[in-house]
Regions:
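Secretory targeting and sorting signals
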Residues: 1-21
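Extracytoplasmic/secretory-pathway segments with low complexity and glycosylation-like composition
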Residues: 17-220
Length: 220
């Protein structure tokens, strides 16, 4: 998976005072988590306005403080914070920016967070058997592809879905476990992403799965 931008910083400019009703720009419908490190979680870009100029602000996610800072002279605040960690499935979360000087000045937004993952069922099967592929975290409005590599070379690319089936980038498909005639024994690498052409460093979210093909011998 590509490294998801996930730095935490509140930035404030300088301008003449001008206060309005507190509001926040809408959040994305879903964010992606691929690990507990901030760099493994998608960045949430926050923009809120209407606070007391230079007021002290606190940003929380699900009541947990993520960062603090001050509004600018316009009463505006921007922040870039990592999405919350999600190890399995998806869930909703609430992001809140509140002001210390005036507790009534509160801006909030809700969204969802999903883990990034791909599952093959059953896990053990003949390479030619049709199995179920499912995944989540592929949130681009684009097709979802699977690239099969062996020995460092792309052997086949298939399309699992024309587009994700939900805002959190889910898909399901039934395909041959390895769509190659008589695949060689050894470790095959399946990379699922949203790019038609394979790249070891894709520009979309990606998940890699190792499929081990073993050689069987018939008794005489």
């Amino acid at each position: 998976m590509r490294a998801l931008l996930a730095t935490v910083v509140l930035t404030f400019g300088v301008a003449a005072p001008a206060q309005a009703a507190v509001s926040m720009d809408p959040l994305k419908l879903c964010y992606v988590s691929d690990g507990d490190l901030p760099s493994q979680r998608e960045a949430i870009h926050v923009h809120a306005s209407g606070f007391t100029p230079t007021g002290h602000l606190t940003l929380t996610i699900d009541s947990q403080t993520v960062d603090t800072g001050r509004a600018d002279a316009f009463g505006m605040a921007t922040a870039v914070v990592p999405a919350p960690f999600q190890g399995f499935g998806e869930r909703p979360f609430t992001l809140v920016v509140s002001e210390a000087e005036n507790p009534q000045n509160v801006a909030s937004g809700t969204s969802r967070v999903t883990n990034l993952g791909v599952t093959l069922k059953p896990k053990r099967a003949r390479p030619s058997r049709r199995i179920r592929f499912s995944g989540r975290g592929f949130t681009n409005l684009a097709p979802i592809y699977g690239h099969y590599l062996f020995g460092g070379k792309v052997r086949r690319t298939v399309r699992f879905a024309n587009a994700p089936s939900s805002p959190c980038g889910t898909f399901r498909a039934r395909r041959k476990q390895i769509p190659v005639k008589r695949p060689a024994p050894g470790d095959w690498l399946l990379q699922v992403d949203q790019q038609r052409r394979y790249s070891p460093t894709p520009g979309s979210n990606a998940q890699r799965v190792v499929i081990r093909v073993t050689e069987t011998f018939k008794q005489p």
